[in-house]
């Protein structure tokens, strides 16, 4: 695509009057990826500023540079105000606006995004769709998976992925949309058909600073959804009637609304919920019909996830029989209330719970399965929201019999300092503090017996531990299996 043609998609940029009008062969934000003909977009990040690498990009063959200020480079430089947003728009245009050729479903919220997105994908596959998935665990194009670096990739990677999906015949893409991605403009230019909200509880306050700012970031998914009446296919906002933030999201969107819930009246509801150690049965009540469904998942949070997925499917006009069939065929997601079975006579559960709300929910669910003592191994991430540390500790102490505090990706922080922050919330309480995560897991499993439950919280599907700028292999489920086998 010619540079002048590409720049027409940036409506707030002065018309490009350079003598050169090169063919753009790729769009890059990392100077190391630049090749002959690339358009290099300078992005100022947390630790690195792309403007400092403009000359390097030009020397590697960049045809032009988009920047927020003057840079030292012997190629055309286009100055604009917001390069992050520009990167999203330019990437969308360069790859042929692929989301306009997909049914795009975005799911945002503090907890439940990963499980819900997998449920949605399963229902749509049952309906005959060829699906794509973008999320915390991986990116998936039909049956092929790729490692994910962020919950929501950078905009240029995102649009490139959508292009691959379209080229490989995908018709429906489901993606987790993080508050960071919304605030940074990574999804600017994505043409969503359905946007869904799971819940809003404390997380990422190291980045957003206040819950109001966090809520506003989430609301951007709904405010940019567009008007329902300007499209052949209506746009839908799917909202949790039991979460107070939904009222705000309903105000900022002009899309059609579809609600779900358990406590408050909603379009899609779960009634007569019955939980057992290995599954949950409830009545699914929707505008398309009602049916009793059984899922091999436990916990009220999983019922909410199913309701979100069902509401999304209804918004997409999937037949009710297909929705219930998809729900009945659901499987657990790795690291989400994952049962570890190595022949022991007590449940060991690995879960991604890393926020106060998610930890409380999963501990309450575990309590329902516990006849004896409830053990929880829990830590808090380094270089992240410090205010949730004492709250997480208090929840662990209040809801578990044997809380074990430990390290969970301390990153650049001293793990002992993180444990001290946690302990500030539980002075005088009973708990164990074992900084080495492997030793903490071994301790909990060594002391558990029949009738007890061991919950290992925080890392879920992650297979690494980040300590002091280094990344080490670490898998909670694998460590738990090893502990069970060695301690038999």
Curated annotation (Swiss-Prot):
Obligatory cofactor(s): Mg(2+)
Record: residues binding UDP-N-acetyl-alpha-D-muramoyl-L-alanyl-D-glutamate: 31, 150-152, 178, 186
Similarity comment: family membership: Belongs to the MurCDEF family. MurE subfamily.
Cellular component GO terms held in the UniProt record: cytoplasm
Functional description taken from the UniProt entry: Catalyzes the addition of meso-diaminopimelic acid to the nucleotide precursor UDP-N-acetylmuramoyl-L-alanyl-D-glutamate (UMAG) in the biosynthesis of bacterial cell-wall peptidoglycan.
Post-translational modification: Carboxylation is probably crucial for Mg(2+) binding and, consequently, for the gamma-phosphate positioning of ATP.
Keyword field contains Cell wall biogenesis/degradation: yes
Keywords assigned by UniProt, alphabetized: ATP-binding, Cell cycle, Cell division, Cell shape, Cell wall biogenesis/degradation, Cytoplasm, Ligase, Magnesium, Nucleotide-binding, Peptidoglycan synthesis
Sites of N6-carboxylysine modification: 218
Residues reported to bind meso-2,6-diaminopimelate: 384, 408-411, 458, 462
Motif (Meso-diaminopimelate recognition motif): 408-411
Name of the gene: murE
Protein name: UDP-N-acetylmuramoyl-L-alanyl-D-glutamate--2,6-diaminopimelate ligase
Matches recorded under SUPFAM superfamilies: MurD-like peptide ligases, catalytic domain, MurD-like peptide ligases, peptide-binding domain, MurE/MurF N-terminal domain
Residues binding ATP: 109-115
Biological process, per Gene Ontology: cell division; cell wall organization; peptidoglycan biosynthetic process; regulation of cell shape
Subcellular location: Cytoplasm
UniProt catalytic activity: UDP-N-acetyl-alpha-D-muramoyl-L-alanyl-D-glutamate + meso-2,6-diaminopimelate + ATP = UDP-N-acetyl-alpha-D-muramoyl-L-alanyl-gamma-D-glutamyl-meso-2,6-diaminopimelate + ADP + phosphate + H(+)
Species annotation: Bacillus licheniformis (strain ATCC 14580 / DSM 13 / JCM 2505 / CCUG 7422 / NBRC 12200 / NCIMB 9375 / NCTC 10341 / NRRL NRS-1264 / Gibson 46)
């Amino acid at each position: 695509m010619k540079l002048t043609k590409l720049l027409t998609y940036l409506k707030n940029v002065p018309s490009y009057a350079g003598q050169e009008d090169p063919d753009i062969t790729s769009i890059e934000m990392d100077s190391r990826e630049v090749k002959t003909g690339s358009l290099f977009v300078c992005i100022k990040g947390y630790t690195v500023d792309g403007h400092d690498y403009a000359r390097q990009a030009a020397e590697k063959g960049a045809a032009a540079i988009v920047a927020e200020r003057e840079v030292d480079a012997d190629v055309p430089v286009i100055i604009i105000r917001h390069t992050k947003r520009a990167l999203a728009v330019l990437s969308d245009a360069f790859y042929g606006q692929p989301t306009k050729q997909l049914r795009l479903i975005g799911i945002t919220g503090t907890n439940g995004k990963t499980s819900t997105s997998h449920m949605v994908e399963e229902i749509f596959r049952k309906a005959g769709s060829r699906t794509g998935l973008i999320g915390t665990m991986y990116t998936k194009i039909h049956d092929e998976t790729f490692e994910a670096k962020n919950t929501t990739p950078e905009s240029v990677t995102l649009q490139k992925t959508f292009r691959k999906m379209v080229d490989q015949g995908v018709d429906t893409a489901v993606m987790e949309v993080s508050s960071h991605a919304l605030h940074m403009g990574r999804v600017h230019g994505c043409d969503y058909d359905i946007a869904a909200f799971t819940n809003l509880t404390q997380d990422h306050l190291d980045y957003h600073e206040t819950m109001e700012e966090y809520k506003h970031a989430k609301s951007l998914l709904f405010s940019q959804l567009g008007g329902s009446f300007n499209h052949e296919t209506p746009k839908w906002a799917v909202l949790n009637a039991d979460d107070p933030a939904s009222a705000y999201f309903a105000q900022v969107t002009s899309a059609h609304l579809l609600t779900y819930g358990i406590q408050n009246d909603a379009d899609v509801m779960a009634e007569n919920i019955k939980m057992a150690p290995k599954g949950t049965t409830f009545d699914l009540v929707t505008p398309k019909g009602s049916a009793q469904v059984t899922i091999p998942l436990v916990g009220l949070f999983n019922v909410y996830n199913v309701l979100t997925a069902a509401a999304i499917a209804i918004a997409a006009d999937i037949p009710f029989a297909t929705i219930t069939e998809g729900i009945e065929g659901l499987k657990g997601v790795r690291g989400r209330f994952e049962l570890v079975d190595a022949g022991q006579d007590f449940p060991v559960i690995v879960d991604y719970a890393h926020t106060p709300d998610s930890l409380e929910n999963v501990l309450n669910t575990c309590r329902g399965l516990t006849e004896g003592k409830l053990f929880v191994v829990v830590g808090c991430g380094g270089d992240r929201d410090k205010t949730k540390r004492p709250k997480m500790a208090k929840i662990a102490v209040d809801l578990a019999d044997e809380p074990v505090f430990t390290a969970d990706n301390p990153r650049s922080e001293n793990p002992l300092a993180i444990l001290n922050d946690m302990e500030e919330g539980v002075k005088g309480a009973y708990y164990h503090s074992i900084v080495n995560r492997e030793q903490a897991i071994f301790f909990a499993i060594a002391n558990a017996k029949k009738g007890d439950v061991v919950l290992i919280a925080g890392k879920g599907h992650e297979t690494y531990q980040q300590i002091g700028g280094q990344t080490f292999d670490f898998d909670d489920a694998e460590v738990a299996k090893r502990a069970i086998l060695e301690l038999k």
